[in-house]
Amino acid sequence: MLGDIGEFIRGKRFTKADYADSGVNVIHYGEIYTRYGVFAEQALSRVRPELADSLRYAERGDVVLTDVGETVEDVGKAVAWLGDEKVAIHDHCYAFRHSMNPKYVSYCMQTASFIAEKTKYVARTKVNTLLISGLSKVKIPVPYPNDLERSLAEQSRIVAILDKFDALTNSISEGLPREIELRQKQYEYYRDLLLSFPKPGEAAA
């Protein structure tokens, strides 16, 4: 379960009035499902530097996810933070701090099986809200869970494969919509297939 392999750290609020051309790097929850992909090395927004001490931060390697969204699919959308410096996160974001490959965790959070499990813990009100206490019970596949070195090596191998598919899918600047759609479906199929081995505590089929 996610709660067994890491911890969730909630961000702190900042508003549109706090934005500035320079200052503290921040991730707003709305940017995660509109402007970020699987991972990010640079923040897209900044707030006034005098807010620095009042904010809460994600560190390099954390996976930042949203807890609200207009759709159930948007809720829990994740981005692995790979920037050299920490980044402040909005209070509708959580930083998942763990010891796994951050891109691997981010890819896992995109799979159909994870989304299906995640939806069990979404409170469907005017704004869909993710219950972190529930999300912490969701499992992700951990290769070789009893051998950290081997596990990290396998996570890196899977990430390298998925990175290639992700680059192919998202780097298309021209092409027929049908071709792009087919490539996206192919990517999603192989991503889910690569990440479909038994989760800790489950027996192999």
Predicted regions and their residues:
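Charged, alpha-helix-forming regions
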Residues: M1-A205
